[in-house]
Amino acid sequence: MKLHTRTLLAPSTRFFSSTSIHRALNRPHRPHSPTHAQSKPQHESRFQPRTGSNLSPRQTRFGNNNERYGSASGKQLGQNDRYRGDFAPKRYNNHNNNSNNNNNGGYPSSNVNSRNAAPPNQKLNINHFANDKFAKDGYYTRRDLYELQEILESSTESTRDAIRSLLNQLVDIAPDRFVNLVTDQGLKETDIKFVIKNLDLKKEGISIHSSSRKADSKTEDGADKGASTKPQLPIVRIRPIRDMIQAYSEEKAKLKELELISMGSKKALRQMDKKLKTAQKQSSEKSIQFTWGISMNDLKNQKFNELKNRLLGSKGSNKVNLYLIHDQRRADWSVYDIYKKDQLGEQVKLELKRRQLVKKTVEEMLNNEELGWTWTSEGDVETKLVYSITKKPTTGGTNSTSTIKQTDKNRDGTIRDKKKEKLGSAVSASISLQQAEPKPPAKEKKKLTDEDLDALYSFKIDD
């Protein structure tokens, strides 16, 4: 009996070696089907899934590290991962990523480093952004650069260069990329990338104005609030694409001129000298300032007489600059900055209507024909207006063009009177000659009438 037992135990040790037993014990539980996995009761705490997730027991045990697993083919599996194919966790296809795909535009969530992930099926080259400030130090991520490149692909080269120049300027004045966009409802705080994304680059462009001022550190009474003040966001306006490209070309020309001057170009130095002389000449011209809050009565009477004395007085100049500003301290401020506490925008609308009325009244005064002034304007009603007014050259001291026209009319009247006198004398002479000479045709008529009467009488007598 003992011999028989030994013979039975001997072959069994071949099939159950220590290695196979170790593998069998350490092998995790794998259900045969999803339905079987759901119906099977949960047991053995190390194989139970996490609470609130739909991960399989195997994913629970080995973790949910997407970067470790790599792709769905299972080529980059861990040391303890023996199963391949469908059992390997897929990239961007687990529970944590699926919950964020709808809110993130279909791109992977932040746990896969989505800030630097490029959009799918994207064949764009962003290497030409390498020298731009906004492409460095994480100001614009790679994904943002891909989106920006896709937007700029449909525009012209000059438009692309202008927008890149504005974005480089924005790096220094808006570190977090947030700006105040001027809309019909007032200022709207938004990211600059959304502003560019919503532009029609065939018609629309942008302009950036920095609002670096220290007025917020003081109250209306003049008391100091303190050093901790919120930094002001730059103001962005939607403008025609032609104006944006023109402003960029002018700025580029200035930079090129400075570069030529630094290289010692004589031609550039002469042009700079001419510009400085014209600027000094313009600064020596007389100027007068009106505020937007002026009353219509003062504007039409007192201020208008002051303007006429500047141009037509004994010591008047040939040119005067008229400034329409908010006040002396806030001459360059926008109406949106002055009434920034107006949430509904009602004060801004009323102020803009009043400024339009002041502008219309001033231009009606300048277009007076009796004065004969010529003028040009720069700026807008949102910030300030500058009128350059010149008077026409006149002859004979301070006579205006109206007096010259009056003398021409008087001269024409005297010439006409002389012509009428000559014609009247000629007509009177011809009438006197006609009265002095006899009229033979009248006598012949009388003779004919007498002969006819005699013939008529003789005819009656014969009867």
From Swiss-Prot:
Pfam families with a match to the protein in the record: mIF3
InterPro entries: AIM23
GO cellular component, one term: mitochondrion
Entry keyword annotation includes Transit peptide: yes
UniProt keyword Transit peptide, yes or no: yes
Composition-biased stretches (Low complexity): 94-114
Protein known as: Altered inheritance of mitochondria protein 23, mitochondrial
